[in-house]
């Protein structure tokens, strides 16, 4: 199973990806985790990324794709993988499709976790309070959600046009959402 999980901040992507990893016995790949690991390892791509981040710039799609290509070349992804939160824009979606085609591992499905914006604000604000983070105030969360909507809505359409998209209601208990994802994937 080669799967992408999409959803706005607070939708439960990371939580469900961890659960799907256990269910399908395939690795959960987060580009954020990849980036941190490459920087920590001091790899050539990690050093490039560190330099970019030190300037306060965003890591380029090219660097992210290079890291992803290296990760997808590892033995543990032979039976599939779960990509969490990537691609975030249509350029990344096209690049990912090209990469997966090149290595003969096309996506099986893309799951979009749908959660109403106001509930997302509540979830993130609650999580921020529990973790003592003051930067996740409702206004900044709304801005992050708007950025997500602006950049990711076209990605949803991209995969919908290719017949790969499954929309799943992300509201409910962890087990209920996992069950819905399983049903959407025909499991």
Curated annotation (Swiss-Prot):
Binding sites annotated in the UniProt record for ATP: 10-15, 127, 172
Higher taxonomy: Bacteria, Pseudomonadati, Pseudomonadota, Gammaproteobacteria, Lysobacterales
Domain of life assignment: Bacteria
Keyword field: ATP-binding, Cytoplasm, Kinase, Nucleotide biosynthesis, Nucleotide-binding, Transferase
Biological source species: Xanthomonas campestris pv. campestris (strain ATCC 33913 / DSM 3586 / NCPPB 528 / LMG 568 / P 25)
Pathway the protein contributes to: Purine metabolism; AMP biosynthesis via salvage pathway; AMP from ADP: step 1/1
Gene field: adk
Main subcellular location of this protein, as a coarse class: cytoplasm
Residue ranges of the region described as NMP: 30-59
Protein name: Adenylate kinase
Region described as LID: 126-136
Assigned protein family: Belongs to the adenylate kinase family.
Alphabetical list of HAMAP family matching this protein: Adenylate_kinase_Adk
Domain writeup: Consists of three domains, a large central CORE domain and two small peripheral domains, NMPbind and LID, which undergo movements during catalysis. The LID domain closes over the site of phosphoryl transfer upon ATP binding. Assembling and dissambling the active center during each catalytic cycle provides an effective means to prevent ATP hydrolysis.
Catalytic activity: AMP + ATP = 2 ADP
SUBUNIT field: Monomer.
A molecular function GO annotation: adenylate kinase activity
Physiological role: Catalyzes the reversible transfer of the terminal phosphate group between ATP and AMP. Plays an important role in cellular energy homeostasis and in adenine nucleotide metabolism.
Top-level class of the enzyme under EC nomenclature: transferase
UniProt entry tagged with the keyword Cytoplasm: yes
Residues that coordinate or bind AMP: 31, 36, 57-59, 85-88, 92, 133, 144
A Gene Ontology cellular-component term: cytoplasm
Cell location: Cytoplasm
